[in-house]
Amino acid sequence: MTDHALLLVNLGSPASTSVADVRSYLNQFLMDPYVIDLPWPVRRLLVSLILIKRPAQSAHAYASIWWDEGSPLVVLSRRLQQQMTAQWTQGPVELAMRYGEPSIESVLTRLAGQGISKVTLAPLYPQFADSTVTTVIEEARRVVRDKQLDLQFSILQPFYDQPEYLDALVASARPHLQQDYDHLLFSFHGLPERHLNKLNPGHSLEGSGDCCANASPEVRTTCYRGQCFSVARDFAARMGLPDDKWSVAFQSRLGRAKWIEPYTEARLEALAQQGVKKLLVMCPAFVADCIETLEEIGDRGLEQFREAGGEELVLVPCLNDDPQWAVALNTLCERAPVSL
């Protein structure tokens, strides 16, 4: 074993489904300035208001999808970590969560204490967003600075357009698309429009189509919405899907600010009203199934679709611990550029 570790980083999860644990997790998550990008006093006030009712509501949602082994996101991430140990030959493979445990700080501190000198930091997010990729990188920077750790980093870049990722996504989903269905909906996690406007002022996010169809490469590099459409378009091309067989929407809105559109809730209703009876839903913003896929789409989305006139909603599993995904991820991590 060499001194080059691979650190997989996912979002995180409450320690349990108790209201207290969910409140603690939500507080850490929502107080991240990359998640709610408001001045600290305003953010603190807003989060305090959210934490009045949201922990109990979220605890109920977590309880509905919790596994015997624990949080699905954590369990599936652990399984991927195990798969990666057979792929990554340069050193240990570790797992950290941006929020909750195991923390980035605890894992990096332990690795440095074990004599590790190089770390490939792998944020497990196909598309770029400050609230996912940037916050992971900045937290690693903070830990290295505050703990004075002597670590050299390579950083996995967003891989939404990489053939290895797309091929693994197609291979994983193909069995589900070989059954009869009326429509495939790609439901990506949403973001407030202001997050994107800060990165690319003046870039139009209007309409229901790809906002980056005619954008410059510089804009595409940081436009989360355009990268989501890119994934859907490339997937559809690989599967030979006609344009009227698939569409894109964005889920998980929080608060009153305008988020990127079209919204998944509205799209579910519209598809049902258009006569779609059997709907497949993929969530390619996530590489592991979690509360946003299992509960928000698999449970609440199904209920909403049926209430609008649909009959069956099939949630296509995320990549999770698929062996081809592990091979693809290893390839992507091996060519990650040196940074930090």
From Swiss-Prot:
Q: Which GO terms describe its cellular component?
A: cytoplasm
Which pathway does the database say it acts in? Porphyrin-containing compound metabolism; protoheme biosynthesis; protoheme from protoporphyrin-IX: step 1/1
Give one GO biological process term. heme biosynthetic process
**The enzyme's E.C. designation:** 4.98.1.1
Kind of enzyme, top EC level? lyase
Q: Which Gene3D superfamilies match?
A: 3.40.50.1400
Describe the reaction catalysed, as an equation: heme b + 2 H(+) = protoporphyrin IX + Fe(2+)
Q: Which residues bind Fe cation?
A: H189, E292
Q: Which UniProt keywords apply?
A: Cytoplasm, Heme biosynthesis, Iron, Lyase, Metal-binding, Porphyrin biosynthesis
Superkingdom field: Bacteria
Location in the cell: Cytoplasm
Tell me the GO molecular function terms: ferrochelatase activity; metal ion binding
Protein family per UniProt: Belongs to the ferrochelatase family.
Q: What does this protein do?
A: Catalyzes the ferrous insertion into protoporphyrin IX.
The protein here is known as Ferrochelatase
This protein's species is: Pseudomonas fluorescens biotype C
